[in-house]
């Protein structure tokens, strides 16, 4: 891995589990984009996420205000019990190294779980660009790999996640 990459880029250098959502070829990090051999390119946004579904229009049900409100509720601890159960499952799953959060919303669970399990690699997807922006902006250590993606057709290679 190129150690000269900025931290928010470096975490995507090992994102070998992903396939181009257009042609299903392997994606590799080239400068500040994930690219395939067929020249499809997906840029790293300034907030630290990659949009692998640029053709998808965001639903009005998934607006920024909705996710900001949800983030406040989650941060207030109303769903702490769920977080603790999932964290315990990860603690008991020693062989699970690569974790996929599908429908990550504003990133509460991925962010908190990564803080508790820094030895694991977290990939988090949501179809809402607004929610992924909130997630990426609220993470300071660039440890979670954030993606906008079509949850019905995730661009992930078979058997690449635990």
Predicted segments with their positions:
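Conserved SAM/SAH-binding beta-strand->alpha-helix loop
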Residues: 128-130
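N-terminal auxiliary segments of SAM/dcSAM-dependent transferases
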Residues: 2-60
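Conserved class I S-adenosyl-L-methionine
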Residues: 95-105
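Class I SAM-dependent methyltransferase Rossmann-like catalytic core
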Residues: 64-81
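Conserved SAM-binding loop
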Residues: 135-136
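Conserved SAM-binding strand-loop segment of SAM-dependent methyltransferases
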Residues: 141-153
């Amino acid at each position: 891995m190129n150690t000269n990459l900025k931290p928010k880029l470096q975490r995507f250098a090992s994102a070998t589990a992903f396939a181009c959502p257009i042609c299903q070829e392997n994606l590799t990090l080239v400068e500040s984009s994930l690219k395939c051999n067929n020249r499809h390119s997906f840029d790293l946004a300034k907030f630290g996420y990659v949009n692998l579904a640029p053709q998808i229009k965001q639903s009005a049900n998934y607006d920024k205000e909705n996710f900001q409100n949800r983030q406040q509720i989650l941060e207030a601890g109303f769903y702490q019990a769920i977080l603790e159960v999932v964290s315990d499952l990860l603690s008991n799953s020693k062989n699970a190294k690569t974790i996929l959060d599908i429908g990550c919303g504003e990133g509460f669970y991925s962010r908190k779980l990564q803080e508790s399990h820094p030895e694991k690699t977290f990939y988090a997807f949501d179809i809402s660009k607004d929610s992924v922006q909130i997630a990426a902006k609220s993470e300071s250590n660039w440890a979670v790999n954030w993606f906008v993606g079509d949850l019905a057709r995730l661009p992930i290679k078979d058997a690449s996640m635990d």
